[in-house]
Amino acid sequence: MDKLKISANGPLNGEITVSGAKNAALPLMCAGLLTSGTLRLKNVPMLADVATTQKLLQGMGARVLTDNISEFEINGGTVNNTCAPYELVRTMRASILVLGPTLARFGEAQVSLPGGCAIGSRPVNQHLKGLEAMGAEIAIEHGYVKAKGKLKGARVAMDVVTVGGTENLLMAATLAEGTTVLENCAIEPEVVDLAECLVKMGAKISGIGTSTMIVEGAGELYGCEHSVVPDRIEAGTFLCAVAITGGRVVLRNAAPKTMEVVLDKLVEAGAVIEAGDDWIAIDMRQRPKAVDIRTVVHPGFPTDMQAQFMALNAVAEGSCRVVETIFENRFMHVPELNRMGANITTEGNTAFVQGVERLSGAVVKATDLRASASLVIAGLAARGETVVERIYHLDRGYENIEKKLGSVGANIERVSG
């Protein structure tokens, strides 16, 4: 099993190209099931979850071609299987996103209940409730969601803001008969990206980027070409890496307007930030200052950046509180950071961080995707060698992270065994 060996190597300097967003690419790939035409996606990150989604779509009969760099062609005209099996779905929560488009187009779907990161119960009840409101008959049998029925437009008010639920219901509504009103929608950039692609495919959607979207069902959707939005979480992770080591790095193919709250927090921590339409520059010449964090739904501070800022705060000047309001059980990186010398205590959904001068390298275990990123960041500033184990979590969401960080001066190496 691969590991990362990391040693502090001073400030980071240079340029990094940000990949396309995993959280946008996966639903966009699933949208290929809505049409018999060809969906051409560009700026797709080559990640484990993308490969799993490719296998899932191919297992359903779709034709999926890739250049293995950043482009995919998905043709749903050959789909002949409406079942998404446990063997593939168990490793990735986003697999549930085939449910809405498959049901809407074929009138039936079977999807195994999903797996993915172990960061609390992220139920799919909002997905199912919305589909039932649109006329689906749904049963859960032997670990599978079994859905059937011709979907019709309806008013769907989600009880909680859910990114996956919004995406699943949005895709389903594009082929439903009549008008669907989706209320309490997630407004994350990745949701907006999906909606904009669906419009290119022929969907009629109003209210994109707001909490209420109205979808006029189309009889048919068509192929199109679409470029995946840049990954704001990957960009934020690299910015935290520079903030903890010092130095100056420019991120290319970035989308600063999608991550303004993260940039504001980095400025509060002492970084100098400059940005253009598609680039972000960070210059850090001092010890970071501790910053309070409270995760909330977009456009607030993203839960997917909480762990990275926890690592930054661990060596910051002063003390702070980090409050996690989105997921329970998302402080699993705290014991590992404390093993490296951090001074962090937790009480319920709040972590109290007292910054220390320096962390010490240690063997640590990744427990989920973003927790693994926080351990990499901590290792870049720790005295001695840090070994991050179980980095298969990292590979689910970061494309060549060791190569990208190495290109700007980080001492980081992937090793086997």
UniProtKB/Swiss-Prot annotation:
One of its GO terms (cellular component) is cytoplasm. Cell wall formation. Adds enolpyruvyl to UDP-N-acetylglucosamine. UDP-N-acetyl-alpha-D-glucosamine binds at R93, D304, I326. Its EC number is 2.5.1.7. The active site is at C117 (proton donor). The gene is murA. The keyword Transferase applies. It is found in: Cytoplasm. It catalyses: phosphoenolpyruvate + UDP-N-acetyl-alpha-D-glucosamine = UDP-N-acetyl-3-O-(1-carboxyvinyl)-alpha-D-glucosamine + phosphate. GO terms for molecular function: UDP-N-acetylglucosamine 1-carboxyvinyltransferase activity. SUPFAM superfamilies: EPT/RTPC-like. This is UDP-N-acetylglucosamine 1-carboxyvinyltransferase. Belongs to the EPSP synthase family. MurA subfamily. It comes from the Bacteria. Pathway: Cell wall biogenesis; peptidoglycan biosynthesis. It comes from Neisseria gonorrhoeae (strain ATCC 700825 / FA 1090). The modification 2-(S-cysteinyl)pyruvic acid O-phosphothioketal is found at C117. Gene3D superfamilies: Enolpyruvate transferase domain. Pfam families: EPSP_synthase. Keywords: Cell cycle, Cell division, Cell shape, Cell wall biogenesis/degradation, Cytoplasm, Peptidoglycan synthesis, Pyruvate, Transferase. InterPro entries: Enolpyruvate_Tfrase_dom, Enolpyruvate_Tfrase_sf, MurA_subfamily, RNA3'P_cycl/enolpyr_Trfase_a/b, UDP_GlcNAc_COvinyl_MurA. One of its GO terms (biological process) is cell wall organization.
